A protein has these predicted regions:
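A detector of short terminal or domain-flanking linear segments
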Residues: 1-7, 11-12, 29
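Short, charged, surface-exposed hinge/linker loops at domain edges
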Residues: 1-6, 41-79
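An amphipathic alpha-helix/helix-turn recognition signal
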Residues: 15, 33, 40-41
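Short amphipathic alpha-helical segments
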Residues: 19, 36-39, 47
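Hydrophobic residues in alpha-helical membrane-spanning segments
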Residues: 24-27, 62
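A short, exposed loop/beta-hairpin motif centered on an aromatic-Gly-Thr core
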Residues: 26-37
């Protein structure tokens, strides 16, 4: 089993929802009515995204080399 640690960006939307994106997985996004729900949903989305990449032979992108400090949380996805 392999574990991926992925940085997540959470954005508070005007309609009280939270959007979640993973910059290292282009197009991988989700949302929730709370920060916690958005994190749970983005973890599920990341698992599907990574499983699909592995199954189709695309390989999983490496984390970005940029050095940045994030206040946002990270998630761990184990496959």
């Amino acid at each position: 089993m392999k574990t991926f640690i992925l940085k997540v960006t959470l954005i508070k939307e005007n309609d009280s929802r939270w959007s979640a994106i993973i910059p290292d997985l282009p197009g991988c996004s989700s949302w929730g009515y709370s920060q916690q729900e958005a994190l749970e949903n983005i973890k599920d989305a990341a698992e599907v995204y990574i499983e699909d990449m592995i199954e189709t032979g695309q390989g999983v992108p490496s984390p970005s080399d940029r050095i940045e400090i994030f206040d946002e949380p990270a998630i761990a996805v184990s496959l």
